[in-house]
A protein has these predicted regions:
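Metal-dependent enolase-superfamily TIM-barrel catalytic cores that perform enediolate-based chemistry
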Residues: 45-156
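Residue-level detector of anion-binding/catalytic polar loops
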Residues: 39, 79, 107, 159, ...
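Shared catalytic-loop signature of beta/alpha-barrel
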Residues: 1-3, 12, 133, 144-159, ...
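Conserved, mostly hydrophobic/aromatic
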Residues: 24, 37, 81, 137, ...
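Predominant activation on well-ordered alpha-helical scaffold segments within soluble catalytic domains
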Residues: 25-30, 41, 96, 122-125, ...
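C-terminal extensions of enzymes
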Residues: 247-328
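Metal- or metallocofactor-binding catalytic centers and their adjacent structured scaffolds
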Residues: 1-35, 298-303, 314, 322
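N-terminal amphipathic alpha-helix/helix-capping segment at the start of soluble metabolic enzymes
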Residues: 33-34, 38-52, 257
């Protein structure tokens, strides 16, 4: 407060929560760009592309829901969808379901939650290698398992992405642990994302920009993607919002979106929508019952999603055959 926003160009603004820091950075770049009447990307670097590849996102879900989410993403113009795997659903069944509905141009980025050991995850990746729809896997191993990452990368053909590198991202790159790295959320602020993005580009290693928000944050990610030479794609969860503060949504055509050319972020806020959202009562979450039916005949009841590794002692994906349902 009371400071010149130009004091914070490329600053991390580390106030404890990366999403808030990056949201604040987006607001500052919007203000600076509008002050100078230039697009925000001109304050970040030299523009190298007019459009940036973008990915849709969905929550962990059973195969039949995953099929519908893929169709939704295709209908919205995406060629790529990210989803976290989880203990409760079978990634092989999800992949089989995806192959039945996805067009040949479509790919999945699975996030494996950085919770497994090499002996568990390698056989899973070897099987997924046979699927044309699996494009990449994020965080297949515990992040601090440096030797495991190196050995896994040597043994699999699936490109591996690392999110939240424990050594800061550049040491992991020098050790050859991953084929690409996630920048943005949970990895430091905007300055860190820009610095690592340029460093990865110099090393000819792709990065993925991940932020969370609607059109405003999506625009910010596109401005970053406009100047980083080796950006693979962005993920912002914009596809999950039925409502948005912007007067116009950013289009997705053939898997990519145009970099806004207006001053600042290049997105205009609908003030009337903003006021309606401010006045709205918070949504109430329903209480849900989780039912896990194991292959041996046992049934486990839980409040919501149970922590199966803690309850039954096996790593995600190492035991198959159970079915999980949620009921209100």
């Amino acid at each position: 407060i009371g400071r010149n926003p130009f004091d914070f160009i490329n600053h991390d603004l580390n106030i404890g929560l990366s999403q808030w820091c990056l949201g604040l950075s987006a607001a500052l770049y919007d203000a600076m760009g509008k002050c100078l009447e230039i697009p925000a990307y001109k304050l970040m670097g030299t523009k190298v592309r007019d459009r940036v590849a973008v990915a849709a996102w969905t929550r962990p879900c059973p195969p039949e829901v995953f099929s519908r989410e893929i169709q939704r993403a295709v209908d919205q113009g995406y060629n790529l969808l990210k989803m976290h795997t989880c203990h409760h659903y079978d990634v092989y069944e999800q992949t089989d379901a995806a192959e039945q509905v996805a067009p040949k141009r479509f790919r999945i980025q699975y996030d494996f939650n950085h919770n497994r050991s090499l002996g568990v995850v390698l056989p899973i990746l070897k099987r997924l290698e046979k699927s044309w729809v699996v494009g990449s896997v994020e965080d297949p191993l515990v992040l601090t398992d440096i030797d495991g990452w190196r050995r896994l990368r040597e043994k699999t053909e699936i490109p591996l992405y690392m999110h939240v590198p424990p050594l800061g991202g550049l040491q992991e790159m020098l050790h050859g642990l991953a084929d690409g790295y996630i920048i943005g959320e949970y990895c430091g602020g905007f300055g860190d994302a820009l610095q690592r993005g340029f460093a990865y580009s110099k090393a000819n290693i792709p990065s993925v920009i991940q932020l969370t928000g609607g059109s405003l944050i999506t625009a910010f990610a596109l401005h970053m993607g406009a100047v980083l030479p080796r950006v693979a794609h962005t993920i912002t969860l914009d596809d999950n919002y039925t409502e948005d503060l912007a007067k116009e949504r950013i289009p997705v055509i053939e898997g990519c979106s145009p970099v806004p050319e207006g001053p600042g972020l290049g997105v205009e806020v609908d003030e009337a929508k903003l006021q309606r959202m401010i006045a709205r009562e918070p949504s109430q979450l329903s209480k849900v019952l989780g039912i896990t039916r194991f292959a041996g005949g046992s049934t486990l009841y839980s409040v919501g999603f149970p922590n199966l590794e803690a309850l039954v002692g096996y790593q995600e994906g190492s035991v198959r055959g159970h079915k999980f349902d949620l009921r209100e």
